[in-house]
Amino acid sequence: MEYSELYVKRIRSLCQKRGITINKLATMSDVKQSTLDNIVRGLTKNPRVKTLHKIALAFNMTLSEFLDFDELNAYSFEDDNDD
């Protein structure tokens, strides 16, 4: 799994657990619908920290809580060529 896919998985998982659509998340986070769609569809590979922070706040989480999940913590950068 690519690094950028981990954010998508996290966002989708939290939306599903909380019964929130991506459209609703865009409204709650004050992130443009198109920006969030691009992240979720994998078109934006490296979302800005500010964007992730807004998404985290919409989930009532700190940025560190949002980024603290098993798949991301276990990710190995050995085969990753992105900088």
Predicted regions and their residues:
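The alpha-helix within a helix-turn-helix
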Residues: C15, A26, A56
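DNA major-groove recognition helix of helix-turn-helix
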Residues: C15, V40, D70
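A short, Lys/Arg-rich alpha-helix, primarily the initiator
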Residues: M1-T21
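Residues in the helix-turn-helix
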Residues: K24, T35, E65
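Short, charged recognition helix plus adjacent turn
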Residues: K45, L67-D83
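Recognition helix of helix-turn-helix/homeodomain-like DNA-binding domains
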Residues: V31-N46
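DNA major-groove recognition helix of helix-turn-helix/homeodomain DNA-binding modules
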Residues: K50-E65
